[in-house]
Design a protein with these regions (language model features):
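Helix-loop-helix
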Residues: 1-207
Length: 207
């Protein structure tokens, strides 16, 4: 974890500065709030990364539409891996689909996601404005466990929306992940700073 933090430190510093700027904006409009600042910054980040997100979703949908034909090829050439690979490549070329295209947007987004994670996890809040709604401190976990529940629920909804419609073993694995990931995110949110969990929930809402 410390290694990741050091590698992405320049972007972490940038994100921390953006949180400060967003907070200063809330001061200018007469409602100083780190909670509002985090929400505003999250929306801005999602807007900036929107083209990549759209590209990723389109790629996933294209792969989903190819699932029936891919299944046919897998059944037909299950004993001939070389032929299967050649036919799959021909199918991708025919339909203009790159199976790796959906990964690139995610890889581009990862540094920013990691950076905002570290920026909010250790952000030096002004203690005069660290309270938000029912939360006594954005730098501490939610004592009422509302945010962990919201993080799990929003992650589950996002997982359902982005499911690829896979079949067979892949479908079973996808079903397991759809259950596991929300529970995992909800669990780790129990110990994460509330400000960070707010970012995650809002990010899922605007996915």
């Amino acid at each position: 974890m410390e290694f990741l933090s050091s590698v992405f430190q320049p972007i972490v510093d940038l994100m921390s500065t953006l949180v400060t700027y967003a907070f200063q904006l809330t001061q200018m409009i007469g409602y100083p709030s780190y909670g509002v600042a985090i929400i505003l910054l999250t929306i801005v980040i999602k807007a900036v990364l929107a083209p990549l997100t759209v590209k990723q979703i389109k790629s996933m949908k294209a792969m989903q539409e190819l699932q029936p034909r891919m299944k046919e090829l897998q059944d037909k050439y299950k004993n001939d891996p070389a032929k299967l690979q050649a036919e799959m490549g021909a199918l991708y070329k025919e339909m203009g689909v790159n199976p790796l295209a959906g990964c690139l947007p995610l890889l581009v987004q990862m540094p920013f996601l990691i950076a905002i994670f570290y920026a909010l996890q250790g952000y030096p809040y002004d203690q005069n404005y660290v309270q938000f709604l029912w939360l006594p401190s954005l730098g501490e976990p939610d004592p009422m466990y509302i945010l962990p529940v919201l993080s799990a629920l929003s992650t589950w909804i996002m997982s359902k929306q982005t499911s690829s419609g896979a079949t067979g073993a892949a479908a079973q694995q996808q079903k397991i992940m759809t259950i596991f990931m929300p529970l995992f995110i909800g669990y780790i949110s129990l110990s994460f700073p509330s400000g960070l969990v707010i970012y995650w929930v809002v990010s899922n809402v605007f996915q």
